[in-house]
C-alpha cells in the first residue's frame, strides 16, 4: 500500500535570531546539531526552512512563547553574536 505524503511549501518572512549550546536536548528530544537544528513555535517538527543563502535548517526545538514569525538557528556562540537578528524571507516546507 502506498502512503500519501502531504507537503506544504510556502514563503514566509521570519524574524531570525540564533542560539548556542545549553547542554540540553531540544524540545523534540534530540541533541541539537550545529547548522541543522532550529527552533520555531508555529511550525511542526521536521519542517525544513531554507534561508536566502541556500542553507536549510530543520525545526527540532521550540521557543515556548507561542511566536508566529520567529526562527532561532542553532550555532556556535561566536557565530550567534555575529548573526544578531535578521528579517529574512524564507522557503518553508512542512512535513
Regions found by a protein language model. Name each.
Residues 1-3:
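Positively charged n-region of N-terminal signal peptides that target proteins for export
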Residues 8-95:
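Solvent-exposed, well-ordered loop and adjacent helix/strand elements within mature globular domains
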Amino acid at each position: 500500500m502506498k502512503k500519501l505524503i502531504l507537503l506544504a511549501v510556502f514563503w514566509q518572512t521570519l524574524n531570525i535570531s540564533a542560539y548556542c549550546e545549553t547542554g540540553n536536548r531540544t524540545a523534540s528530544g534530540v541533541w541539537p546539531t550545529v547548522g541543522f537544528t532550529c527552533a520555531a513555535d508555529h511550525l511542526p517538527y521536521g519542517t525544513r526552512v531554507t534561508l536566502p543563502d541556500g542553507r536549510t535548517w530543520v525545526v527540532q526545538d521550540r521557543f515556548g512563547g507561542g511566536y508566529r514569525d520567529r526562527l532561532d538557528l542553532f550555532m556556535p556562540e561566536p557565530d550567534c553574536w555575529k548573526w544578531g537578528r535578521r528579517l529574512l524571507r524564507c522557503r518553508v516546507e512542512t512535513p
